[in-house]
């Protein structure tokens, strides 16, 4: 089964007090819902309309569990604590992987996706 992912990218600096209140609730809410923090950083190179603020990536067992984590009472309480203290872009998506087979013919290398 494909994994589910929660991606949060801040579009503007957060209000420090509201951000702290949010963080105290959001992390435990995501862990309680089965999330595993893969990355969290403010060291971001943004391209094509991206913004270089805090970015967080959390992995879940499935797309459905990632959506359930966002909609959980615990995470909604964290959002209430944030109370508009940050402009964020939230994405929940299903991770679909593909395999790459390299084919070498003479001196040429080809990549075949399947």
Question: What does each of the following model-derived ranges do?
Answer:
Residues 67-71, 76-91:
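C-terminal structural segments of small proteins and small subunits
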């Amino acid at each position: 089964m494909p994994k589910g992912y929660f991606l949060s990218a801040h579009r503007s600096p957060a209000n420090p007090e509201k951000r702290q209140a949010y963080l105290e609730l959001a992390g435990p809410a995501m862990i309680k819902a089965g999330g595993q923090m893969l990355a969290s950083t403010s060291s971001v190179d943004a391209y094509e309309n991206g913004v270089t603020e805090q970015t967080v990536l959390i992995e879940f067992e499935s797309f459905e569990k990632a959506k359930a984590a966002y909609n959980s009472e615990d995470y909604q309480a964290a959002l209430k604590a944030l109370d508009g203290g940050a402009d964020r872009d939230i994405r929940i998506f299903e991770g679909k992987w593909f395999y790459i087979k390299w084919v070498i013919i003479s001196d040429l290398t080809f990549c075949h996706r399947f």
